[in-house]
Amino acid sequence: FILDALRRKTVDHADHAASLPALGDLSVANLFGGGDYITGIEIFAVLGGDSIEKGALAGMSALKELTVPFVGATKNDTGEEGLFGYIFGSDSYSGSFEIKSGLSAEDYISPELCFTFYVPQGLKKVTVLDGDVFDGAFMNMRTLTEVVFADDADTTYIGEAAFMGATALEGFTVPAGVSIVGDYAFCFSGVRTVDMSAADEITVLPEYIFGENTRLATISLPENLVTIEGYAFYMASALKNIVIPDSVTTIGEYAFYACTSLESVSLPANLKTLGASAFSRCLSLEGMEIDQSNKDFVTYDGILYSSDYELAYVVPAGIVGPVRMPEAVTIIPGGFFSECKNLKGVIFHDKITAIGDSAFAYCTGLETLTIGKNVTNIMENAFIYAGNKDTVINFETGSKYAYVKKDAFYRLTAKEINLPASAVTFDGEAFRMCEAEVKFHEDTTLTTVVADMFKDYLGTSIELPASVTTIGARAFMDALNLETIEFDATKITSVGFDAFRNTKWYNSQPDGIVVLSGLAYEIKGARNTLTSVTLPADTVVLAGSLFNGCSNLTTLVLNEGLLAISGSAFANCVNLIELVIPKTVTSIGAQAFNNMSATIVFATDGSLTHLGDQAFYGYKGKTLNIPA
């Protein structure tokens, strides 16, 4: 027997007494004079119902294959005695490596709750002759590539986390008699192929059974399966296709979430319940299919809807399009196309009235998107991180889109947005962090660039329509890339404070009065050092608060051709002696002369037609002569 074992380097206990009863302190390695040459052991039975003691196989450093009558100490042991590593013991030896095996997924995450065993580094294959596989049995067995069961094995149960962390597993066939598989059974394992087809008593795939298994490529499911629970294949990123049996009625939330290689799915006729995000972030999935006899779901252009189209259950992340929207859909819901990075476009019909928040988030493949004419509401973040340097956003002729809300185009990375003529009302920060060039329609009647409208805008240039008369406070503030700003200064009657502050254009200007297209916008540098100023001859508008607080200014010469003086333009110029208002000035804003005592001289043939509210509020001069 020993000579035969030495010759074959395997120990076969099939025909020898007391395969592995209690051996006292004598391990198998000691029995055969050391375990550094035995590569295979087959244990077919333990006589008299005795157990395999803890550490019975300690020291078997050359072991590559092992056949056991059951997993653990006895056929029915659970707890530590039901773990595969138990028979190798908790003492290290040459050629062993440490594993941490627990009884649940929580133990896997918290190794301090696990049991420590030392198993041979080269152990690759284990054959189980009989019995169930209890919770955590093969947890963290990182060298095993194969675990097989005898054809006549009475195996009905594979426990929770049974193969969790067994990262080298190649293939696994579930024994025909198995009816229950526990949660997390193959979570974090490396099993590539799984065959469950013979286990026709399995009706439930539990939570996380294959969760975060990044090597699982193919699987055959049992034909009587009814439920695929939530997170069952969560982030199984190598899974390419799966055939879901006709018997399945329920697929839980996040069941196939982030199965990034999944290319095709055909849903069965009996499916009644589909959980939230069941197929979200399946980046290779271009379209969904469902049996046409299914009464609860329907597909339209590759998207899975409820049969009445009131809910969209799956928008495949790999969808290309352009995608047509069903007539029954009147709103593109929040997050609808989120992370559809291959989406080229969407075809709107006339019944669509709104685009929800994050509806096109991260749709980086958009080419040309023409928004339907009846869309009146675009929610915040609708296009966050959408588009690319070639993307164009258009609005259909006759568009009714009038009100642009805050962050409607936040983080849009498109080439350009061509706004419709109807878009005349804007919130502040409507284009915050937007990289697209914003183009106004030639027929727009927009009059006001509201406060903060382009604050933090990331575009490089902008041309305001000729209809604009007012630029609000901080309108372009912190638009760090903005180097070209075009508008008709002759039409501007009011510019708010810090309107262009910290733009690329502004930051390139020298100290002194900053003039843009005839707009004297701001004094850059120290204001209180100015004593005498003569405006450039082409100045047509003074921005709000332009000279506010220039306390040492004594002489100010305004140019002929100046048209408008914005609010608080001369406020607090306490030492200014005289101010001559050119006859070309037609408009003076609110509190323009607050807290100043200079003599103000108006031309008798002047063109003044507008005085703002409280234009002379706080004026301390003695005489005013305002032309009729």
Annotate the PLM regions.
Residues 6-25, 29-51, 61-77, 96-132, ...:
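Structural signature of tandem-repeat unit edges
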Residues 55-56, 86, 135-137, 159-162, ...:
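Consensus positions within tandem repeat domains that build extended binding/scaffold surfaces
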Residues 55-59, 79-82:
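A structural signal for leucine-rich repeat
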Residues 74-87:
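Short, flexible/disordered intra-domain loops and linkers
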Residues 84-96:
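Short, well-ordered amphipathic alpha-helices
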